[in-house]
Regions:
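N-terminal secretory signal peptides
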Residues: 1-17
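N-terminal twin-arginine translocation
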Residues: 16-21, 30-46
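N-terminal cap/lid segment of alpha/beta-hydrolase-fold proteins
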Residues: 44-77
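Short beta-strand element of the alpha/beta-hydrolase
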Residues: 81-90
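Cap/lid segment of the alpha/beta-hydrolase catalytic domain
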Residues: 118-143, 273-274
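Alpha/beta-hydrolase active-site loop
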Residues: 134-158
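Primarily recognizes the serine-hydrolase "nucleophile elbow" in alpha/beta-hydrolase
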Residues: 151-217
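Short beta-strand/loop motif that positions the catalytic acidic residue
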Residues: 230-232
Length: 301
């Protein structure tokens, strides 16, 4: 049986579809159609990063189960080799926001790869039905996701433009939790940045939900292979501040003094998602600055 659990940090009323997502025609309709309609804000003015000076393309490579795993890749023009950043999406998959994040990283000198973890079941990106999205996401378990990340690392190692000994990972919401998990599993990862990924089970979680979510980041602090930066919102209704404090304490107890969590006091969940009403420009920019500082020190040195 597939257990359906609420996506990390989100509730259905936080991501109600807007009039734009329901098909209101606008001059920029084709542009906005590339964003996840389940969360697109009517007043969104998302960042649009062009591909000038970049090579941006789709790729596919074999996962451990034989599935041809699709991914979006953006990298600077030229032979490289370039340091790598794996980008792990939110529950909405590889839609335009995630592709734009990849292009932003490529503009900063990285080769960015965003695997499409959910498409074995269905691509959630074009869906406006949140319950359908939840069912798709619930099917992507820990073993599959870690296997897909391992396959991504293998594929990176075979690319002439990739600096395969300098690899970072970042992810948002569902992907933020996966960052903590991956950093505890893969010694080839040199740094991670986790944006508002759930750290531990919700206070009202059932035993089934607790089991389905394992391993939880709070239980992995002693296994982290390299530095992790967590970026969290103080007004995130799905990730209470006391769980962030517990994670900070667990990192200290494990001796991971290089890893830290930044808590933006007034930020909600999804504060980096510029296509959603949750976007907080100042906090998103500060978090991005910190990401670039960490990756610059760990991947470009």
């Amino acid at each position: 049986m597939t257990l359906i659990t609420r996506p990390e940090g989100l509730s259905l009323d936080q991501i109600a579809p807007s009039r734009r997502s329901l098909g209101v025609a606008t001059a920029g309709g084709l542009f906005f159609a590339a964003y996840a309609p389940a969360a697109l804000s009517q007043s969104a003015q998302p960042i649009a990063t062009d591909a000038a000076g970049l090579i941006a393309q789709d790729a596919a490579y074999p996962a451990p189960d034989g599935f041809a795993l699709p991914a979006y890749v953006a990298r600077p023009e030229g032979a490289g080799p370039f340091p790598i950043v794996i980008v792990v999406s939110e529950i909405f998959g590889v839609h335009e926001y995630i592709r734009d994040v990849c292009r932003r990283l490529a503009k900063a000198g990285y080769a960015a790869i965003a695997p499409a973890f959910f498409v074995r079941v269905q691509d959630p990106a074009p869906l406006s039905d949140m319950q359908a999205v939840q069912r798709i996401v619930a099917a992507a378990g820990y073993d599959q996701v870690m296997g897909d990340i391992g396959a991504t690392l293998d594929w990176i190692g075979a690319q002439s433009w990739a600096k395969a000994d300098k690899v970072g990972i970042t992810g948002f919401c569902w992907g933020g939790k996966a960052v903590w998990q991956a950093m505890a599993r893969f010694p080839t990862l040199d740094a991670g940045v986790a944006w508002y990924g759930r750290l531990s089970p919700a206070a009202n979680a059932t035993e089934e939900q607790k089991t389905a979510g394992r391993p939880w980041p709070i239980d992995l602090t002693g296994e982290l292979k390299a530095q992790v930066l967590g970026l969290y919102g103080g007004q995130d209704g799905g990730i209470p501040n006391d769980t962030v404090k517990a994670m900070t304490d667990a990192l200290a107890a494990a001796g991971r003094t290089d890893s830290q969590i930044i808590l933006y006091d007034d930020a909600p969940h999804g504060f980096h998602a510029d296509y959603r009403a949750s976007y907080r420009e100042a906090d998103a920019k500060d978090g991005w600055r910190r990401l670039l500082e960490l990756f610059g020190s760990r991947l470009k040195s």
